[in-house]
């Protein structure tokens, strides 16, 4: 019968202790990694990377494939004018800031129509245009939206977001109180459509729907700045389903961004932040 010598026993004990210590360290690292992960709004998860199985949509496919191609009309500017226009556009957008103090002064509805039409020119996967812009002007509806968002945002700040995220936001002096949702004359809620419907009523895949809608949001921000209006990009975490029901939107639409829109209130302030320089954001190969 094999007998363990004292030396062998010591070696076995050391190995056992080493295994347990490494297991504990690995567990702690996983816990720390989980704590460091930013909280994700489950309602916004985009499953298009899994290539949704599309139902039989032959009628839709045939009609799309037969779209006529026309000659592209392009205006080419002299180089000097190109430089001037690009510089002027940059200077315009460089003044864009996130404004949390918004006046209740009404804005022309025609301007809102135009900026949303501009956002609707965004490119999209397979030209599916997977966006819905909900414009809210009614004071009672705006207040209901505020109540839902503030209720969830308080939980986000206290529990879901984590200490690091909350600390990073302190320089912006922001919290779960969103007075601008009442004072702004217009709220624009941008929904992504996770799928659409073909002419035969079957589901139609909306490829890269979140990326497409995000591009549209960027164009909308630029259009608002060009029109002389201000906003703050609001992402109402965990509020999507309730706001979708409140606004009567279908289940295949998911809330991506909310923009309160108007003029800045008198005495509005912004944090004195600096943007990264060109050499910090661009790499030329």
Swiss-Prot record:
Binding annotation for 3,5-diiodo-L-tyrosine: 126, 153, 157, 178
Membrane topology: Single-pass membrane protein
Catalysis performed (reactions): 2 iodide + L-tyrosine + 2 NADP(+) = 3,5-diiodo-L-tyrosine + 2 NADPH + H(+); iodide + L-tyrosine + NADP(+) = 3-iodo-L-tyrosine + NADPH; 3-iodo-L-tyrosine + iodide + NADP(+) = 3,5-diiodo-L-tyrosine + NADPH + H(+); L-tyrosine + chloride + NADP(+) = 3-chloro-L-tyrosine + NADPH
Keywords: Cell membrane, Cytoplasmic vesicle, Flavoprotein, FMN, Membrane, NADP, Oxidoreductase, Transmembrane, Transmembrane helix
Keyword Nucleotide-binding: no
GO molecular function: FMN binding; iodotyrosine deiodinase activity; oxidoreductase activity
EC number(s) recorded for this UniProt protein: 1.21.1.1
Domain of life: Eukaryota
Membrane-spanning ranges: 1-21
Subcellular location: Cell membrane; Cytoplasmic vesicle membrane
GO cellular component, one term: cytoplasmic vesicle membrane
One annotated GO biological process: thyroid hormone metabolic process
Record InterPro entries: Nitroreductase, Nitroreductase-like, Nitroreductase/BluB
Cofactor(s), names only, from the UniProt record: FMN
Binding-site residues, 3-iodo-L-tyrosine: 126, 153, 157, 178
Residues binding FMN, per UniProt: 96-100, 124-125, 233-235, 275
Subunit structure: Homodimer.
Function: Catalyzes the dehalogenation of halotyrosines such as 3-bromo-L-tyrosine, 3-chloro-L-tyrosine, 3-iodo-L-tyrosine and 3,5-diiodo-L-tyrosine. During thyroid hormone biosynthesis, facilitates iodide salvage by catalysing the oxidative NADPH-dependent deiodination of the halogenated by-products of thyroid hormone production, monoiodotyrosine (L-MIT) and diiodotyrosine (L-DIT). The scavanged iodide can then reenter the hormone-producing pathways. Acts more efficiently on 3-iodo-L-tyrosine than 3,5-diiodo-L-tyrosine.
Protein family per UniProt: Belongs to the nitroreductase family.
Record-given protein name: Iodotyrosine deiodinase 1
UniProt organism field: Rattus norvegicus
């Amino acid at each position: 019968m094999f007998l363990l010598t004292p030396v062998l026993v010591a070696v076995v004990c050391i190995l056992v202790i080493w295994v347990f210590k490494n297991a504990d360290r690995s567990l702690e690292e996983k816990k720390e990694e989980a704590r460091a992960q930013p909280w994700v709004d489950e309602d916004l998860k985009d499953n298009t990377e899994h290539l949704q199985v599309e139902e039989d949509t032959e009628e839709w496919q045939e009609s799309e494939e037969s779209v006529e191609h026309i000659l592209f009309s392009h205006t080419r500017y002299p180089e000097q004018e190109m430089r001037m226009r690009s510089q002027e556009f940059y200077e315009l957008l460089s003044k864009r800031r996130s404004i949390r103090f918004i006046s209740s002064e009404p804005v022309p509805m025609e301007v809102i129509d135009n900026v949303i039409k501009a956002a609707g020119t965004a490119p999209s996967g397979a030209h599916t245009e997977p966006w819905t812009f909900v414009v809210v002007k009614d004071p009672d509806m705006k207040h209901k939206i505020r109540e839902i968002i503030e209720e969830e945002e308080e939980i986000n700040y206290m529990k879901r977001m984590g200490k690091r995220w909350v600390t990073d936001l302190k320089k912006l002096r922001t919290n779960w109180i969103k007075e601008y949702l009442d004072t702004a004359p217009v709220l624009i809620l941008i929904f992504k459509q996770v799928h659409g419907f073909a002419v035969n009523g079957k589901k139609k895949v909306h490829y890269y729907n979140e990326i497409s809608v995000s591009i549209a949001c960027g164009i909308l921000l630029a259009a608002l700045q060009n029109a002389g209006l201000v906003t703050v990009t609001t992402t109402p975490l965990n509020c999507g389903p309730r706001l979708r029901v409140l606004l009567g939107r279908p289940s295949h639409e998911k809330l991506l961004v909310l923009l309160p829109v108007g003029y800045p209130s008198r005495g509005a302030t912004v944090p004195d932040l600096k943007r990264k320089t060109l050499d910090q954001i661009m790499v030329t190969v």
